[in-house]
């Protein structure tokens, strides 16, 4: 009986140790293999003369060129109230490319901007119209909340 107990303990230990090493085929696929993604990052918000300049980094990993991509955004002030709605036109976004685009928002105060909300894709030419919103992944490098 002692031999059986010792053998079971040894077998249990070996099994527990082997579970820590997952074979490559069982590991998660990289994010790029998860499906098409249109990454949009709010990279900076800087005051300019009478304006707030928003800088975006966009990466088109949809697998197709976009001849035009534009999004309606809502800007929220520091009280959480919508200040305005506007459309940002990112123009052409080639497949597999990263692009930096800046927009000067006349009369906007960067210091009072608390949130940028993407309402909808007003243009998404090159893929199915809903693909730009469905595959959109947002992030921010600023203190301003950014997303859908």
Language model features with spans:
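Bacterial N-terminal signal peptides
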Residues: 9-20
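Terminal connector regions
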Residues: 107-148
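Short aromatic-acidic-glycine turn motif
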Residues: 75-86, 127
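Sec/Tat signal peptide C-region and signal peptidase I cleavage site
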Residues: 21-26
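Asparagine-centered strand-capping/turn motif at beta-strand->loop junctions
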Residues: 58-62
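Short acidic/proline- and small/hydrophobic-mixed sequence motifs that coincide with surface turns
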Residues: 65-68
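Intrinsically disordered, low-complexity Pro/Gly/Ser/Thr-rich segments with frequent PxxP/GP/PP motifs
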Residues: 82-112
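Low-complexity, acidic Ser/Thr/Pro/Gly-rich terminal tails and inter-domain linkers that flank the onset
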Residues: 27-51, 55, 142-147
